[in-house]
Amino acid sequence: MAGKSSYDYEELLACARGELFGEGNAQLPYPPMLMFDRITEISETGGAFDKGFIRAEFDIKPDLWFFACHFIGNPIMPGCLGLDALWQLTGFYLGWLGEPGKGMALSTGEVKFKGMVTPSVKKVEYGVDFKRVMRGRLVLGIADGWMKADGEPIYAATDLKVGLSKQSAVA
């Protein structure tokens, strides 16, 4: 899979259905929780730490589900959804590398919000730059991420951690 460098919306939906990386491996959430429309670039090299990166975009439309409820009269995309997008991309990258197991967000270091996504925003861009991928009982990706709204940096997160485990989330 590491040969492909971009993914369109239909391919992301295939990943959400468990069809992209094989049964029992990394999946994206299905809409409306899928927080990007395309992956524009993914690479095992480059990025801020020269250990790989992933970039994605989300087209913002005024009728997106979260604007109707967060907040009435003051619509704003919840910050946690932007953070979740960064975790989603981190897990996708691990699956793209061919690592086995289901993904789970584990933690993040510091998160800073410097702006908001409102219905007037046209496009959100995400970037995740990998610091390390650890392979053991659990595959662990550690990365820093950022988010831009119409080209302006608005979120930054350090030490995003996502793990892949062969164990089911259902006990």
From Swiss-Prot:
GO terms for cellular component: cytoplasm. Its main location: cytoplasm. It comes from the Bacteria. Pathway: Lipid metabolism; fatty acid biosynthesis. It is found in: Cytoplasm. The keyword Lyase applies. Homodimer. Belongs to the thioester dehydratase family. FabA subfamily. This is 3-hydroxydecanoyl-[acyl-carrier-protein] dehydratase.
